[in-house]
Amino acid sequence: MIDFFATWCGPCVLLASELEKVKAELGESVRIVKVDTDEEATLSTQLQIQGLPTLVFVGTDMEKPALRTEGMLPAEMVKNIISNEL
C-alpha cells in the first residue's frame, strides 16, 4: 500500500494513525510505503495524485490493477480492501 500524504494535511495525520492500527493487526503481510507529496512533487504529478490523503493498494497478483482511494478511511475499511480486493 502506498500512502500519499502531506504533513500539513489534517486527514493525512488521522489516516496515519489508522494505518498504524492496520499494520499492528496484519503485521508483515502488509507493507506501507509513505510518500510526502511536497517532497515528491514530480512523482505525485506523474501519478496524478490530486486529493489527499490518497492510498494506492497494490497486491501480489500483477494481473489485478492497483486500487486507489482518496480521503480518510478507518482501519476496518482499509483491512476490508486488503482482504477483499487484493
Q: Where do the model's predicted regions map?
A:
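Short active-site neighborhood of thiol/selenol oxidoreductases, capturing the structured segment around
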Residues: 1-7
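Hydrophobic beta-strand core positions in alpha/beta domains
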Residues: 3, 23, 34, 56-57
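The canonical Cys-X-X-Cys-His
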Residues: 9-12, 55
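Typically the conserved alpha-helix immediately C-terminal to a functionally engaged Cys/Sec
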Residues: 11-27
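Structural microenvironment flanking redox-active thiols in thiol-disulfide oxidoreductases
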Residues: 22, 35-45
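Hydrophobic/aromatic anchor residues within beta-strands of the central parallel beta-sheet
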Residues: 30-32
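A short glycine-leucine-enriched loop at secondary-structure breakpoints
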Residues: 46-50
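Non-catalytic, surface beta->alpha helical segment in thiol-disulfide oxidoreductase systems
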Residues: 51, 56-86
